[in-house]
Curated annotation (Swiss-Prot):
Leader sequence segment: none
The protein's role, per its UniProt record: Component of the molecular motor that translocates viral genomic DNA in empty capsid during DNA packaging. Forms a tripartite terminase complex together with TRM2 and TRM3 in the host cytoplasm. Once the complex reaches the host nucleus, it interacts with the capsid portal vertex. This portal forms a ring in which genomic DNA is translocated into the capsid. TRM1 carries an endonuclease activity that plays an important role for the cleavage of concatemeric viral DNA into unit length genomes.
Name of the protein in its database record: Tripartite terminase subunit 1
Record-level GO cellular component terms: host cell nucleus
Organism: Human herpesvirus 7 (strain JI) (HHV-7)
GO MF term (any one): zinc ion binding
Record's keyword terms, sorted: ATP-binding, Host nucleus, Late protein, Metal-binding, Nucleotide-binding, Viral genome packaging, Viral release from host cell, Zinc, Zinc-finger
Length: 721
């Protein structure tokens, strides 16, 4: 078993223990005191694991994070805190025997720690604060950090992610089941946007398309059904003596008998149609009437499935809740000698009926309640006079009955009946035509209104399902955190002092810059260079251009901007900046040793625009340099692996933003044009230059020392000066 497998096994075992530890919070402390020895043994194991692994996990995530290690760091810290809190609360309960105070301590009701004010520092020491209170806020902050990834120093970025992990420990605790107050079901995430990007937008903006969409990525909804029918599982867990105590056996029998009767039955016309169709199979001769009957039966079943009545009534669920509560009290009397009071029934008499509607029952599946609410809403709609009239004149039901009557009447006929008649053979009846058209118009209007109401009911049903069912913490937040932390870790320059320093002066910078200013960039290069700029600007969360089925870099950047709620005018500024131009004087704006320097800027928007300008100048200047001198310099982000021998590494670090790597030698630069001069100078071979005949050269290697082939065929007027 390798280390990753061992880590996964440990994570699985800890998750199992964490679930049991979370359940203890909801129990009556009276039930915990007799078994305190086992609790403390397990607590010692958790404390030992925390002291052994936690520091190493933090170090691992600081250098090379993964979703599993981040989750383990959160889980270990939360379990450690929970064990200490439980032990202290039980000890206090033994002294004062106050359950009210015990539950207040366990659930920390007198304090609120679910808020974080995160301070984020940028490259020019500009600091701003972000308020976080939900998982959605964390995901949105990561998306915004993704857009300004180049403006955040690696150390500040990793520290911010570490604070987020600490806050997740408080927010989530030991249980992966999320509390309703720690997430917003209608706030979408990056994955929601990715799903919408796969379907046509029908001319709607992304904000309109995302409005009303339920996010099932940050928290994944798990439907709980048939919880009330699992009395047989309880019966298997009880020993024989417990089953024979008091009314335990009687209560379990009553719960089992509640759901024996099913209230729903098919409509009579549908049952009769199915009995008729059962006589026809694949090899039978199918008359037109039978085919029509089958088709109308199909559509009738579809409509019945939409308005099908629930098989369990609200009275049955209320009775089930009462019987389960009585069964719990009987079992607790046998095991502990008294009726236990867990957190669910503690002060239950103070809960109003309206509150109970939101609280629900721990013995009843949320899906059952949602189904009942939905069907009651549909039933109330169908009792409206308009829809009652429509139900009486159900066209599909009428046609099925007509076809059944025709089949019965024509059972002894030898000649099949023709169902299609020519309209010109019928007498024209104006009043009948008006009545038919009016009825068709009313039918169309009614069906349209009914469809809209049904759509609204289904949307509300989806919302209630999201709220009432179990929501498990998804892995999307851990994946995003690990990607962000690894991207910052790759940018760390631990060995920066080992790199050679820039050996050139302002004259060298000016020499390259002045010579490039007299040239023009080929127009046909601009589209590819724009993609190159988008690639360098895109953060680690939206690198779709590196996927197995890659998208273009501009789409990756567009996704990042949309998810981070970029303002439209900022998107326009970015697009105009990246468009580029063939004239160097429009983009060569950086002064000597000021590349990626943001001094004097005190606004995030201005810093973003300045970063875009720096990236544009880097990409276009290197492209022009390659075109003029026949070079093949490439630009990559620091930490990315490429097979290129000569490359420029973009570090996004204000101290040393550029590194030039040739083979195993790396030199750091604060100036772009000094870097280009370094490449040009070190490529020249003075021995070859001195042996070249019939060509006049300046002794010192410089811009004019170009290597040409067949120089003897060049007229003297081009090189004699």
């Amino acid at each position: 078993m390798n280390s990753l497998q061992s880590l996964c096994v440990l994570c699985s075992r800890l998750s199992e223990c964490a679930l049991e530890l979370e359940c203890l919070r909801f129990c009556d402390p009276v039930t915990l005191i007799p078994d305190m020895t086992n609790f403390r043994k397990n607590g010692v194991v958790i404390i030992h694991l925390f002291k052994t692994l936690f520091a190493e996990l933090c170090h691992q995530n600081f250098n090379c994070a993964s979703p599993v290690t981040i989750y383990l760091q959160i889980l270990l810290k939360a379990m450690y805190n929970q064990v200490l809190l439980l032990d202290a609360s039980i000890h206090q309960f033994l002294l004062d025997n106050d359950k009210q105070k015990y539950f207040e301590n366990i659930f920390q009701l007198n304090e609120c720690k679910q808020h974080l004010k995160l301070d984020l520092a940028l490259n020019n020491y500009l600091t701003f604060s972000v308020d976080i209170s939900t998982i959605n806020d964390i995901e949105k902050l990561l998306c915004k950090m993704n857009c300004i990834f180049g403006l955040i120093s690696p150390l500040d970025g990793i520290n911010a992610c570490s604070q987020i992990i600490e806050f997740l420990t408080i927010l989530c605790g030991v249980c992966v089941v999320m509390k309703p107050e720690v997430f917003s079901e209608t706030t979408t995430c990056l994955k929601c946007y990715e799903e919408l990007s796969l379907v046509p937008n029908q001319g709607k903006s992304i904000r309109k398309r995302l409005a009303g969409k339920f996010c099932n990525h940050l928290t994944e909804t798990h439907m709980v059904s048939n919880l009330e029918k699992n009395v047989d599982i309880i019966e298997k867990d009880l020993d024989f003596s417990t089953k024979q105590y008091g009314l335990v056996k009687e209560y379990m029998a009553k719960i089992t008998n509640i759901f024996q009767q099913q209230l729903y039955s098919k409509p009579p016309h549908l049952q009769e149609a199915e009995n008729t169709l059962i006589n026809f199979d694949l090899f039978s001769k199918i008359p037109d009437t039978i085919y029509s009957l089958s088709e109308f039966t199909y559509w009738s079943k579809i409509s019945e499935s939409v308005i099908q009545k629930a098989s369990i009534t609200l009275n049955q669920l209320n009775l089930c809740h009462s019987l389960y509560a009585d069964l719990q009290n009987e079992i607790s009397k046998f095991l502990y000698g008294e009726t236990i009071q867990d957190v669910f029934n503690f002060n239950e008499e103070n809960v109003t009926n309206d509150d109970k509607l939101y609280i629900g029952s721990r013995f009843i599946s949320p899906c059952r309640l949602v189904d009942i609410i939905t069907n009651v809403s549909i039933k109330n709609l169908e009792e409206d006079p308009v829809f009652t009239k429509l139900a009486e004149e159900d066209e599909i039901q009428t046609k099925i009955k007509t076809l059944l009557n025709e089949l019965e009447n024509s059972a002894h006929e030898t000649v099949p009946k023709k169902y299609v008649t020519h309209s010109m053979t019928q007498d024209h009846n104006l009043q009948q035509e008006i009545h038919i058209r009016k009825k068709a118009y009313y039918q169309k209007i009614s069906e349209s209104g009914y469809s809209k109401v049904m759509l609204c009911i289904k949307e509300q049903e989806a919302l209630i399902n999201k709220l009432m069912n179990i929501n498990i913490l998804g892995n999307h937040i851990f994946e995003s955190l690990s990607k962000m932390m690894n991207a910052f870790a790759n940018r760390q320059l631990q060995s920066l002092e080992n790199f050679s320093a820039d050996p050139f002066t302002y004259d060298d910078h000016l020499y390259i810059k002045n010579n490039l200013l007299s040239k023009k960039l080929p127009q046909e290069l601009l589209p590819n260079l724009s993609q190159e700029m988008y690639r360098l600007l895109t953060g680690p969360l939206s690198n779709y251009h590196t996927a197995s089925f890659p998208l273009s870099s501009n789409i990756s950047m567009a996704y990042a901007c949309d998810v981070a709620d970029f303002l439209p005018h900022m998107k326009e500024d970015l697009a105009k900046c990246v468009e580029g131009t063939i004239y160097p004087e429009n983009w060569m704006l950086c002064t000597y040793n000021k590349f990626f320097n943001f001094d004097g800027l005190h606004n995030i928007n201005d810093m973003q625009r300045q970063m875009w300008n720096f990236i544009r100048e880097l990409v276009l200047s290197v492209a022009l340099y390659n075109d003029v001198f026949g070079k093949q310099l490439s630009i990559v982000k620091f930490g990315e692996e490429t097979e290129t021998v000569e490359k420029i590494l973009l570090t996004f670090d204000s101290g040393s933003p550029l590194l030039f790597k040739r083979g195993t030698t790396t030199t750091k630069f604060n100036d772009l044009y000094s870097l280009l001069y370094f490449d040009l100078k070190t490529q020249c071979d003075p021995v070859q230059i001195s042996q070249t005949k019939q060509v006049s050269h300046i002794p010192a290697p410089n811009l004019l020392d170009l290597c040409r082939q067949n120089e003897n065929s060049i007229p003297e007027c081009f090189y004699n000066f």
